[in-house]
Swiss-Prot record:
Organism lineage string: Bacteria, Pseudomonadati, Pseudomonadota, Alphaproteobacteria, Hyphomicrobiales
Species, as recorded: Brucella canis (strain ATCC 23365 / NCTC 10854 / RM-666)
Cross-referenced Gene3D superfamilies: Nucleoside Triphosphate Pyrophosphohydrolase
Protein name in UniProt: RNA pyrophosphohydrolase
UniProt-recorded Gene Ontology molecular function terms: bis(5'-adenosyl)-pentaphosphatase activity; guanosine-3',5'-bis(diphosphate) 3'-diphosphatase activity
Enzyme Commission numbers on file: 3.6.1.-
The keyword Hydrolase belongs to this UniProt entry's keyword annotation: yes
Keyword match Hydrolase: yes
Length: 178
């Protein structure tokens, strides 16, 4: 990998940066469709300039936090959902690297990408509990709309640099959509 300019204009070597530990959540309804939200783009963030803005909930793991607890916290903070039951936890962590033009800028300039632990949940509640804009608890909205999507469609709806992650997640949880 080559070096790129960070937020201060200094050169950043992506390999010198760690991966941010995160969780990702595939939430399936009773029909086997997956919840996806359309990201609100913030200038300079990892979605800036993207046209494929649909994604599943995801977020950082706080220091000392268990990934399973982080998953439920992130799900609530981003969607308001609490009526879920765990279906499966992916056995492996999945990494992605930011594209070169975002290294040193996105993810607060501190990370080269993310390493994600994925969980699949079944949504057991009423859709009226889903609240994205604004989400509950005074959290900043990340999505401007949401839909239930066929699982197989997800890799083509996400920003291209996360596509391989979504392909792996779909392969891992495909049997849950049946």
């Amino acid at each position: 990998m080559s070096k790129h300019k960070g937020p201060t204009g200094a050169m950043v070597d992506p390999e010198s940066l760690p991966y941010r530990p995160c969780v990702g959540l595939m939430v399936l309804n009773k029909a086997g469709l997956v919840w996806a939200g359309r990201r609100i783009v913030i200038p300079g963030d990892e979605m800036d300039g993207a046209t494929q803005l649909w994604q599943m909930p995801q977020g950082g793991i706080d220091k000392g936090e268990d990934p399973a607890q982080a998953a439920l916290r992130e799900l609530y903070e981003e969607t308001g959902m609490t009526s879920v039951s765990l279906l499966e936890e992916a056995s492996d962590w999945i990494n992605y690297d930011l594209p070169p033009h975002l290294v040193g800028l996105a993810l607060k300039g501190k990370y080269r990408g993310q390493t994600q632990k994925w969980f699949a949940y079944r949504f057991e509640g009423d859709e009226s509990e889903i609240a994205i804009n604004p989400p509950p608890g005074g959290h900043t909205a990340e999505f401007d709309c949401w839909e239930w999507k066929p699982m197989a469609d997800l890799p083509n709806l996400i920003v291209p640099f996360k596509r391989k992650v979504y392909e792996q997640v779909v392969a891992t949880f495909r049997h849950l959509a049946a």
